[in-house]
């Protein structure tokens, strides 16, 4: 068969294979001539051939609908396609696409024009349904902004999607045999949202960067190992959702996406790096079940304008001087009120848990002795604090103190598995190493800090420990005792939490961020509250 046969040119088709309607004479046993339909004749009435004829007959009428304009200067005629002609072209492309996977082998397949269709998965591909939806979208004109091809068991996307001039939203999710998004998808210039969750996509168009209006792309649970470099050219992109894939590397070009607000790469267990040039200040990164250690990149030192810093510095110095005058003459009742305020920040201590209360008192005494000695705050001592707060018990299920957690956890109350998740356990070793480096550097600068500087360090220490949540339990109590240690070592009183920022100072990669300035201000307020309690 001629492989270059134009399936839509019926004259060529007939010349190649003969008239499909011709009847061939034959003879009965009595040698009486009869006419019986040939196999080709019977096939001529199949839906496929009828559609071919219909297209061939309507083509001249459609082509005649073209609008023409003549240039008098050059004597040349220019033709532009009318909507009806565009519809014909798209219909022809889709009809040919459908021919390749009919439920029954088509006549063209019998003749060798295309292979007989395999069954894809447990069901046939619903290409006819996809074709009808596309044509309805085209016929809708400006209202045809959405196209849903979800769960049609497609192994490839239909051709001609770029002919849908008003397409904004494309949903091809749950086509489990779909392995790639075609290159010509980058021609859909007005596309804003793509949902291809739950497929088997291993490759995106290399020129996807041409989609300048694309704002959201969701490719959860696919076979992707990376994203094309050109995605960094999608200047309107705000959301990238690719959890549950096989991504082990992300392009550095993501740093160019200045509008990006959400990057969900959860459950890509081989992913360990993100471009250092990517600004995470305004990007929520969902990194559960990855090896991405990014918390050190969202921790910031507090910054105040000169006027505010001068005012706060004066206030901090005044509080330190007042505490120095009062701390050696506190009555037992005043000390009890301060301790009650500190314990009230913990739901565990507030629940009258005798074992936890005893451990808290032991750890508090240890912090006081370290503060009096002027002992530097180190990572080893913070681990020791957590161990004191979680003494070994008789129950094998009790959390073990002083060890990094090995499970993923989230803040409570929370109804999301990404937005309020603490760092993955796979990243904690590296995260704590970076935290230890920050501690050492801060300790070296301690002699140069004023009272406000000591409060800023204590507030950051509290926030960073709570945000990392490195232990199985007692993370909040460990962080508060570490903060009190940092304050008491420099002649300041403990600072019980008094506001939302100081009670819940954690910042999350995937969601809420608490400014360090707010934590510092509420730490100052907590110190002032202690002073008021002492005066009563």
Swiss-Prot record:
Inducing stimuli: Transcriptionally regulated by HrpG and HrpX.
Start-end of Basic and acidic residues biased regions: 48-60
Cited function: Functions both as a virulence and an avirulence gene in Arabidopsis. Causes disease on the Kashmir (Kas) ecotype, but not on Columbia (Col-0) ecotype. Acts by directly uridylylating the conserved phosphorylation sites in the activation loop of a number of host receptor-like cytoplasmic protein kinases (RLCK), including BIK1, RIPK, PBL1 and PBL2, preventing the activation of these kinases and subsequent signal transduction. In susceptible Arabidopsis plants, uridylylation of BIK1 inhibits the PAMP-triggered immunity (PTI) signaling cascade and thereby promotes bacterial virulence.
UniProt xrefs under SMART domains: LRR_TYP
Family statement: In the C-terminal section; belongs to the fic family.
GO molecular function, one term: nucleotidyltransferase activity
Spans of repeat LRR: 140-164, 165-189, 191-211, 212-234, 236-257, 258-282
Assembly, per entry: Interacts with several members of the Arabidopsis RLCK VIIa subfamily.
Domain of life: Bacteria
Stretches for region Disordered: 22-84
Keyword Nucleotidyltransferase tagged: yes
PROSITE patterns listed in its UniProt record: FIDO
Comment on protein domains: The LRR domain, the Fic/Fido domain and the uridylylation activity are required for avirulence function on Col-0.
GO-annotated cellular components: extracellular region; host cell; host cell plasma membrane; membrane
Main EC class the enzyme belongs to: transferase
Keyword terms, alphabetized: Host cell membrane, Host membrane, Leucine-rich repeat, Membrane, Nucleotidyltransferase, Repeat, Secreted, Transferase, Virulence
Protein name per its UniProtKB record: Uridine 5'-monophosphate transferase
Organism, scientific name: Xanthomonas campestris pv. campestris (strain 8004)
């Amino acid at each position: 068969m001629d492989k270059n046969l134009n399936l839509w040119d019926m004259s060529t088709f007939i010349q190649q294979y003969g008239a499909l309607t011709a009847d061939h004479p034959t003879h009965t046993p009595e040698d009486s001539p009869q006419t019986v339909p040939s196999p080709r004749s019977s096939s001529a009435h199949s839906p496929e051939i009828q559609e071919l004829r219909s297209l061939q007959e309507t083509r001249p009428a459609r082509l005649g609908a073209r609008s023409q304009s003549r240039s008098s200067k050059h004597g040349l005629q220019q033709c532009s396609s009318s909507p009806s002609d565009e519809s014909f072209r798209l219909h022809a492309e889709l009809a040919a696409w459908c021919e390749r996977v009919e439920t029954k082998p088509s006549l063209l397949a019998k003749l060798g024009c295309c292979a007989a269709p395999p069954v894809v998965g447990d069901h046939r591909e619903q290409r006819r349904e996809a074709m009808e939806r596309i044509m309805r979208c085209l016929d809708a004109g400006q209202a045809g902004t959405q196209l849903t091809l979800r769960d049609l068991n497609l192994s490839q996307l239909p051709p001609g999607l770029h002919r849908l001039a008003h397409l904004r939203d494309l949903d091809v999710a749950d086509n489990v045999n779909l392995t790639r998004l075609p290159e010509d998808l980058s021609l859909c210039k007005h596309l804003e949202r793509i949902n291809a969750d739950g497929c088997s996509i291993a490759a995106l168009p290399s020129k996807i960067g041409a989609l300048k209006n694309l704002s959201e792309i969701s490719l959860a649970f696919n076979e992707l190992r990376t994203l094309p470099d050109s995605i960094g050219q999608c200047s309107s992109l705000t959301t990238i959702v690719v959890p549950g894939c096989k991504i082990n590397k992300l392009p550095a070009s993501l740093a160019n996406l200045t509008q990006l607000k959400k990057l969900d790469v959860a459950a890509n267990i081989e992913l360990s790096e993100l471009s250092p040039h990517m600004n995470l200040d305004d990007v929520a990164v969902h990194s559960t079940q990855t090896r991405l250690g990014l918390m050190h990149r969202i921790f910031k030192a507090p910054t105040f304008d000169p006027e505010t810093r001068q005012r706060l510095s004066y206030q901090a110095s005044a509080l330190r001087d007042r505490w120095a005058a009062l701390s050696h003459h506190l009555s037992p009742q005043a000390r009890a009120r301060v301790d009650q305020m500190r314990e009230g920040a913990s739901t565990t201590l507030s629940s009258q848990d005798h074992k936890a209360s005893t451990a808290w008192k032991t750890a508090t005494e240890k912090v006081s002795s370290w503060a009096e000695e002027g002992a530097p705050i180190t990572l080893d001592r913070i681990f020791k604090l957590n161990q004191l707060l979680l003494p070994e018990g008789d129950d094998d299920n009790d959390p073990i103190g002083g060890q990094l957690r090995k499970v993923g956890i989230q803040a409570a109350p929370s109804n999301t598995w990404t937005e309020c998740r603490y760092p993955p356990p796979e990243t904690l070793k590296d995260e704590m190493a970076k935290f230890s480096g920050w501690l050492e550097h801060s300790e070296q600068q301690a002699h140069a800090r004023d009272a406000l500087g000591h409060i800023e360090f204590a507030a950051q220490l509290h926030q960073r420990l709570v945000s990392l949540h490195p232990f199985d339990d007692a993370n909040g109590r460990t962080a508060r005792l570490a903060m009190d240690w940092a304050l008491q070592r420099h002649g300041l009183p403990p600072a019980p939490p008094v506001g939302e920022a100081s009670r819940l100072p954690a910042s999350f990669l995937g969601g809420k961020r608490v400014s360090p300035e707010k934590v510092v201000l509420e730490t100052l307020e907590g110190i002032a509250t202690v002073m008021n309690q002492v005066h009563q």
